[in-house]
């Protein structure tokens, strides 16, 4: 797992678009924000958040973003290349982002579409619980939250 930055924006955007097509189809909405994001927006986002990726043979196959505001870490754009989904990369990257978050983060939040069966299962498996839902175009977003668990003996 390596840090990503603005120089990785082209690869991140390509990966993101490939990964979100499935979600767009599941929700009948091709206007999902990750599919509409421009290269400049991706570059700006990577300059302002913490982001990590996994490469295999030089190819970016998974990435995630973490936005920290006070005690809250918001996980976003957790994506895995379609041909590598189901291999544990998403869960591994999620755990990595949680462990790499600054010490002041006490809670993690994220959201996904209500029809995103795979991601909802992944997040539940990793301890995330639904807090509420909000309307988004012709579907709902499911908002989830998880309290940070500090390893025993770790100073907070």
Briefly describe each language-model feature range.
Residues 39-53, 74:
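A short helix-loop-beta-strand connector motif used in the catalytic cores of GNAT acetyltransferases and
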Residues 53, 78-85, 112-114:
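A short, internal acetyl-CoA/4′-phosphopantetheine-binding micro-motif in the GNAT/acyltransferase core
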Residues 91-95, 114-132, 137-140:
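Conserved active-site alpha-helix within GNAT-family acetyltransferase domains
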Residues 1-14:
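A short beta-loop-alpha structural element at the N-terminal edge
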Residues 75-76, 86-94:
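Glycine-rich acyl-CoA binding loop
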Residues 100-112:
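Conserved GNAT acetyl-CoA-binding A-motif
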Residues 53, 59-68, 74-79:
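Conserved beta-strand in the GNAT
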Residues 14-42:
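Conserved GNAT-fold acetyl-CoA-binding loop/helix
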């Amino acid at each position: 797992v390596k840090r990503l930055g603005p120089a990785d924006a082209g690869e991140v955007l390509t990966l993101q678009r490939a990964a979100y097509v499935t979600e767009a189809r599941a929700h009948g909405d091709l206007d999902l924000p990750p599919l509409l994001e421009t290269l400049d927006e991706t570059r700006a986002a990577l300059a302002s958040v913490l982001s990590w990726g996994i490469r295999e043979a030089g190819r970016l196959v998974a990435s995630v973003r973490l936005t920290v505001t006070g005690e809250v870490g918001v996980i976003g754009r957790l994506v895995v290349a379609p041909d590598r989904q189901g291999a544990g990369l998403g869960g591994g990257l999620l755990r990595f982002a949680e462990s790499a978050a600054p010490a002041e983060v006490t809670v993690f939040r994220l959201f996904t579409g209500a029809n995103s069966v795979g991601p909802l299962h992944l997040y539940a498996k990793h301890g995330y619980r639904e807090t509420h839902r909000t309307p988004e175009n012709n579907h709902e977003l499911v908002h989830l939250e998880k309290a940070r668990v500090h390893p025993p003996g770790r100073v907070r």
